[in-house]
Structures are given as C-alpha cells and as structure tokens.
Regions:
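N-terminal cap/lid segment of alpha/beta-hydrolase-fold proteins
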Residues: 14-54, 294-298
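Catalytic histidine-centered segment of alpha/beta-hydrolase-like enzymes
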Residues: 288-302
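Catalytic nucleophile-loop/oxyanion-hole region of alpha/beta-hydrolase
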Residues: 81, 95-131
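Short amphipathic alpha-helix adjacent to the substrate-entry channel of hydrolases
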Residues: 73-91, 274
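Short beta-strand/loop motif that positions the catalytic acidic residue
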Residues: 249, 255-257, 261
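Alpha/beta-hydrolase-fold enzymes
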Residues: 126, 131-226
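Catalytic histidine neighborhood in serine/cysteine hydrolases
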Residues: 275-291
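Short beta-strand element of the alpha/beta-hydrolase
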Residues: 57-65
C-alpha cells in the first residue's frame, strides 16, 4: 500500500474540510458483511461485536470515537483496508452505542478499558496475532489499555489515530468558537442518551441540570464522572488521559495525529507529551483533519494504508 506523505485534495484545503468531508460524504460497502455477536460482560451488561472473518490468524480490533459505532465510515474504511490484506477484523460498539441502550447505569467513557479487555479476552483464543486500532476517544482508550496491561497475551502492535492524549485540553478546546458545531452535535447525541438512561434510572442524576448544560466539560462533570466513580470532570480527565499511561506501554505503538486536526490543541500536538517510551512512536502530519485523511480517488484512505503498513512491518 501507498507509503508517501499525505497530500489532501486541493478542494479540501484545511482541517475542517478534511474532517467534515469523509464524515458526511464517504460511503463504504464492506468487503464482506459484518457478522454480529453480543457478549455478556462480567457485570451482566452487554457489548455488541461485529466480525469480518476469512480464517486468518491475525485479528485487528477497531475502537471507535465519541458517539460513534461500528457503522461509521472511518471504522468501515479501516476494516476493509485490513480485510483486503488478509486480516480478520473485529469492530465493537461501546456500552450505549448500539441501537439498544445498555442495561446498567454506567455507559462508556475514554478510560473504560475493562470493556476493551473483555473484547480482547473474548477474541484472543482464536488468533496468533492481535492488533489494536483506536480513533479519537477510542485512541485514548486503546493507549490507556496498553499502559495498564503492558505486554498482553497475543497483542502485537497498536495504532492510535486522532488521539486526544490530554482529555482536559481536548474537552476545553471543543468549547471554542471554531468548534461550536462539533460540540453542539456531540451534545445533542449525548443528551439524548442521557435522557434514555435517566428513564431507566431516575435517581442517577438531575434531569433539569442536564437540560441546562451545553459543553462536553459540563456533561463530563455532571454525568460521565459521577456515574463512573470519579469525583468530577477534572478527576476523570486526570485519571483517564492517555498521556499518563504511555511510558508503561510495552508493545510497539504508533500514534498518528494531524497538525490541522480541529479537535487537538498545541499541547496535544507537542511530541514531548508522549514522554520517552521505547515502544511509542508519535507521528504528526501537517494535514489530515480529525479521523480524516480523505481522498477522492482511492478506496483506501492514507491513514488506513498507514496502519496496514505499520502492522505488516
């Protein structure tokens, strides 16, 4: 697959366009349909798994971003890229990200590595090699998982794309004027899920307070943090930011971020944030947007070829 530097189409001349175009207009037909499996977690909730199998002994596990799922174009594009290179693929939905709301009060968040652990443990028995890919929130989740687990079973390499390594920095950055539309879209979806969760568990939080918040930071402070055992948003961000786990990673891991990613801050885009791990490489491209790297001609996007090449090297 192509190994040259990423050059965006001339019409997609900035990070906003490189983010928005693939999110709205990229259409993906899977090379083979997903096969759905639902697994039960140790706490008696469920996770939905979506497989693409071809009797390979190499498996790629894909973790999606905030308010995403296995049907997002960036997930399916990455799935096709690896399936075409003889990998089996497993994409999964976090708690609350399927058509059916999950059973327990807890939902998903950037540090919920117990669920990624459950997915890896469920899949690993059939594969000699497992590779992890995470996008955005899923990138943070993947990196935190690796830092917690060290060298784990058959997990060989990982790739974290559009990784918000400092959650507080990323959250506050969404509350800037240029990111108003992104934050509004996220909040509309998050509030809808929170209302459904409140219908299940009316004592979980104050519904009136939910209707009065408008930022990701406030949502994390009111909903995400207390529901998942954190004191407040600051506590959640400090305990779950991937930057605090990178030096403990024990397998080859590639972080791929774009300098023009509208979701990432100069703090996140400073390579010093990655520390001095012998196992973590941090590549920053000048172009790409957030979970983007689009083109108009090739079926495989640059970031997808990048991940395939990294795993095969």
């Amino acid at each position: 697959m192509e190994k040259k530097a990423y050059l965006p189409p001339k019409l997609l001349f900035n990070g906003q366009l490189q983010t928005i175009y693939p999110a709205l207009f990229r259409k993906i037909k899977l090379l083979t349909p997903y096969v759905h499996e639902r697994i039960i977690t140790q706490d008696q909730d469920f996770l939905d798994l979506f497989w693409m199998k071809q009797k390979s002994k190499k498996l790629v596990i894909i973790s999606h971003g905030l308010e995403g799922n296995a049907d997002r174009a960036y997930v399916k594009g990455m799935a096709n890229a690896h399936f075409s290179e003889s990998f089996d693929v497993l994409a999964w939905n976090y708690r609350g990200c399927s058509d059916q709301i999950n059973n327990l009060p807890k939902m998903y968040h950037s540090g919920a590595t117990e669920d990624l652990l459950a997915v890896v443990n469920h899949a690993e028995k059939d594969y000699h090699e497992i590779y992890l890919i995470g996008f955005s929130l899923g990138a943070n989740l993947t990196l935190k998982f690796l830092g917690e687990q060290g060298a784990y079973k058959n997990v060989k390499k990982a790739c974290a794309i559009a990784a918000p390594l400092d959650l507080k920095s990323g959250s506050l950055h969404l509350n800037t004027p240029k990111n108003y539309l992104y934050q509004r879209r996220f909040m509309r979806s998050l509030k809808k899920k929170a209302r459904a969760k409140h219908a299940q568990y009316p004592e979980l939080f104050d519904l009136k307070k939910l209707e009065n918040i408008h930022t990701i930071y406030d949502f994390d402070n009111l909903i995400t943090a207390p529901i998942h055992g954190f004191e407040h948003a600051e506590d959640y961000y400090e305990k779950c930011s991937a930057k605090n786990f990178l030096e403990n990673i024990q397998i080859p891991t590639q972080i791929l971020n774009a300098m023009n990613d509208p979701f990432l801050t100069p703090k996140i885009l400073n390579k010093s944030i990655a520390g001095h791990s012998d196992h973590v490489s941090y590549q920053i491209t000048s172009q790409g947007g957030h979970c983007g790297y689009p083109n108009f001609t090739a079926k495989t996007y640059w970031s997808e070829a990048f991940a395939v090449n990294y795993f095969k090297s």
